[in-house]
């Protein structure tokens, strides 16, 4: 066990802006128009552009590694997406470490955007 069981991670509030959504989509080479073109996203039934799965995964990993420190190694991640995350949302991450696993949830005002488990060792 790399950390004592039963540790609640500090909350992290991420202000989601159009720049966050567009730049993370471009950084992950996701050129789907729903991540950078509001009109295209609306035509497809969304209220606005939205965060892609690779960005969400990266933010989950960042949340855990910011807490665990530079010696931590992520050994696995399993996530499930829920409600979309749009510009203007605050994506609030919470987590709970038990053994070598961290349960993570990311919520917006409209509901749970992501939930999952990250396996960590040091």
Where are the model-predicted features located?
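A sequence-composition feature that detects small, non-aromatic residues
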Residues: 5, 15, 25-27, 40-41, ...
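Hydrophobic beta-strand-centered segment that forms part of the acyl-chain substrate-binding groove
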Residues: 43-51, 55-99
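HotDog/MaoC-like acyl-thioester-processing domains
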Residues: 1-12, 85-122
């Amino acid at each position: 066990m790399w950390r004592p069981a039963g540790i609640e991670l500090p909350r992290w509030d991420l202000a989601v802006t159009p720049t966050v959504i567009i730049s993370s989509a471009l950084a992950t080479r996701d050129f789907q128009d729903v991540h950078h073109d509001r009109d295209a996203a609306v035509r497809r039934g969304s209220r606005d552009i939205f965060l892609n799965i690779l960005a969400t995964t990266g933010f989950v990993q960042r949340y855990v590694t910011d807490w665990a420190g530079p010696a931590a190694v992520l050994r696995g991640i399993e996530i499930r997406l829920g409600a979309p995350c749009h510009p203007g949302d605050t994506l609030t991450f919470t987590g709970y470490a038990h053994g070598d696993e961290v349960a993570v949830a990311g919520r917006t005002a409209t509901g749970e955007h992501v939930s999952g488990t990250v396996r960590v060792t040091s």
